[in-house]
Amino acid sequence: MNNKLLIIILMSVLGFASCGKENRSERIPEKEPPAGIDFPEDDGAKRLPADGALALRDLLAAVDPAKTLTQGETKITEKQFAEIKQFIDNNLKADSKIQTYNNIFNWIVKNVRYGSGNETIYLDPYDVFIHKVCVCQGYANLFKIMCQSQEIPAMCVNGWLVGVGGHAWNYAYVDKEWHVSDPTNGIDYKMEDTGKYRDMLQPIRADFNLFEDGKFAYNFEEGRLNVAEVKDSGLDYVLVPFSINGFRITSFCPVKKVSGTYDKLYLGSNVESVGENTVYLSSNFSTLREIDVDPANKFLTAYKNVLYNTGNDAPYFIPPAITRLELKPVKVIEKNFICRLENVEEIVFAEGTERIEAYAVEKCRNLRKVYVPSSVTYMDKDAIYDCGDKVEIVR
């Protein structure tokens, strides 16, 4: 009798708690419990400054300059590289590295010009070397290769020429210190003198990997310390670490294809971004179908394997390999709300959704069912578009 009474009381309490949740304005929790994974703990690592010039300065102080002796993203053949090196050896090489560096810089400033109008604009370093007409990226590419040919570590960076727009320039390491070199505009500073250039040159990415460990490679991307490459571990999940070399990792946006058996992603409290354009993550991590986020994360949250910016009910990122997509309630589902999810078979719009506009779901070729709640008062005839002719609308 006592056991039965206890069960009745327990059921009543649970029923009361459930009713209490139903009366709340937010029926879907912002945070979900972790799926049996230990998220990385805050280890006190430094978060990079929001100022790109200061952030890159801090990172480069911890980087082996020799890492920037590789060509990386810059396209050039061995024969072309040898020709440029021979030219410098014969004409610009001096007794000291710093004088050679200055000679290279001055030669580019004097001999290469910025293209305009209907001219052919060159970007690859050898083409710029031969034709001497380019835009800022061409200047930076040639300067990088010329420096590297003389064993002067150098890299290209992209970012903003403040007040003008997107820009490319260089960082080079000579005489045991980094220089910030902008051959397009004929200016050169020591990196430590940030006050002289940070209001003008704001880097947001660098063209090489800063750090590497047994599981990942890391770069400077979108002004953040980013997971750039994921190495095959034989596991089915990727757990983003909290830090590397004393710096907090705040971005997960691989720039190379993620290979191996991975289909799950776990983001700790440190990760703030998976890229401004999530197309890159979808393309490079095409096997991803599950996402979970540390409940302590203040920037991101996951619901039913969909990633959201905290406080925003519109999806930030939908895993490309997801097969059943369940969404938070959004009053109006706009055009291209869901697009090009080749693996999704079912979409569930949540109660609270009111309108589904034309082309809200587009080019999901394996879609079979769309669940539409009673709260939807308008659904355009083309709301589900170019998804084949086998889609069933379930109300």
Which residues are covered by each model-predicted region?
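Short beta-strand/loop segment at the start of cytosolic alpha/beta domains
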Residues: 209-231, 310
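Structural signature of tandem-repeat unit edges
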Residues: 215, 220-222, 233-250, 260-275, ...
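Hydrophobic/aromatic-rich core segments of domains that either
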Residues: 139-202
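Bacterial Sec-dependent N-terminal signal peptides
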Residues: 16-43
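Secondary-structure boundary elements
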Residues: 65-130
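Sec-dependent bacterial lipoprotein signal peptides
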Residues: 1-17
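Active-site nucleophilic cysteine motif
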Residues: 100-104, 108, 132-147
